[in-house]
């Protein structure tokens, strides 16, 4: 009876210690994700072009998604199992473990809802810039003054076109 209680106490201590280790790493990952996403949302995005590190992050996410889709086409399992199912070297050094952890963290960041929302906003900004260049090309072909004035919504209309019969006091 005492031996059984001792085993139960050891098992609970082991469980609590493993949960605390897991929660620390999960908290670190969540803090990293939160820091990265707040930096994305806090910095202002210029209408001309986004900062280079944000585009690099978008490119990295698309690269990771392309790798995952290529692995799925090759017949591998779900997205969660992609890192685990790849052939790993027999001897894992610190660099390979850190690289695998980094890839896994990048996958989680790319799949997070906040980043996907930011990516959609970024694509809309880039598409909006392309639409403006298309409109400017149309203006260059047809140069009428009225069309050019109607195209730019952000400029206020000047009140120099007035009726001759109106009086101002």
Curated annotation (Swiss-Prot):
It is found in: Secreted; Cytoplasmic vesicle, Secretory vesicle. The keyword Secreted applies. It holds the Pfam family Pro-NT_NN. One of its GO terms (cellular component) is neuronal cell body. GO terms for molecular function: neuropeptide hormone activity; neuropeptide receptor binding; receptor ligand activity. GO terms for biological process: blood vessel diameter maintenance; cellular response to dexamethasone stimulus; cellular response to lithium ion; cellular response to nerve growth factor stimulus; digestive tract development; hyperosmotic response; liver development; negative regulation of gene expression. Its main location: secreted. Coiled coil: none annotated. Interacts with NTSR1. Interacts with SORT1. Interacts with SORL1. This is Neurotensin/neuromedin N. It comes from Rattus norvegicus. The lineage of its organism: Eukaryota, Metazoa, Chordata, Craniata, Vertebrata.
């Amino acid at each position: 009876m005492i031996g059984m209680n001792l085993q139960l106490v050891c098992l609970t201590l082991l469980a609590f210690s493993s949960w605390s280790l897991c929660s620390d790493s999960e908290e670190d990952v969540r803090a990293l994700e939160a820091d990265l996403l707040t930096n994305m949302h806090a910095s202002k995005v210029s209408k001309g072009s986004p900062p280079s590190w944000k585009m690099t992050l978008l490119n990295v996410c698309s690269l990771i998604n392309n790798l995952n889709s290529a692995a799925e086409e090759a017949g591998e399992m779900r997205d969660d199992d992609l890192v685990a199912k790849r052939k790993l070297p027999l001897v894992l050094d610190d660099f390979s473990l850190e690289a695998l952890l980094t890839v896994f963290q990048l996958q989680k960041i790319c799949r997070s809802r906040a980043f996907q929302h930011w990516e959609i906003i970024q694509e809309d900004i880039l598409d909006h810039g392309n639409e403006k260049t298309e409109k400017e090309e149309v203006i260059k072909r047809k140069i009428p003054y009225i069309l050019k004035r109607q195209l730019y919504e952000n400029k206020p209309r000047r009140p120099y076109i007035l009726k001759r019969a109106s009086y101002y006091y």
